[in-house]
Amino acid sequence: MLELKDIKKYYTVGGTTTKALDGVSVAFRKQEFVAILGPSGSGKTTMLNVIGGLDNYDSGDLIINGKSTKNFKEADWDAYRNNSIGFIFQSYNLISHQGILDNVELGMTLSGISKAERRQKAEDALIRVGLKDHIHKKPSQLSGGQMQRVAIARALANDPDILLCDEPTGALDSETSLQIMALIQELSKEKLVIMVTHNPELAHVFFKQKTAYEILDRDWSS
């Protein structure tokens, strides 16, 4: 479904070049729950950004459903991000003065579907993440765990093939983190879910060894 072939990414600042990704090769399957482990600065978020089309790679290839992205134009990346990828971050990125239903709808602004369909998809997504009784509330009326559920609903609303999660439990307490992880794990039964974390203890609770890749040691064998 998704494959990275010898992906390299460099950043140059003030004449100094840093290797963020140095020849990463790994393949992911649909209905897989994958953890990318490593400390801050090891390249985890860079890898997630490359997979999500938020950042360009310098060499190698990203293969999506058997298709190379080497010659992708910006319009191709836009279509990929809008239709195939759902992003979940540590920060909820919710607009405080709008209701959570409107927040979820905003994620579908560029999808080209009608207002009525956006509203229905948003409602369905919020119900799916367990917020049926909170649909008409604003973010300020919710707990941290509930706000992260809104963010997950926003990522789900367009029914993407891939969910990319960057430290999704980083701002939550231990009990709430486990609840959110259980929800994300459930979603992996029908989607490819790739999660970045620097917390090996949390990862080892939810991931089998073969689906946890240690980016620090560049061990990309499956």
Question: Each predicted region: which residue ranges?
Answer:
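Single conserved hydrophobic/aromatic residue that forms the stacking wall/gate
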Residues: H204-S222
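ABC family nucleotide-binding domain
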Residues: L2-A203
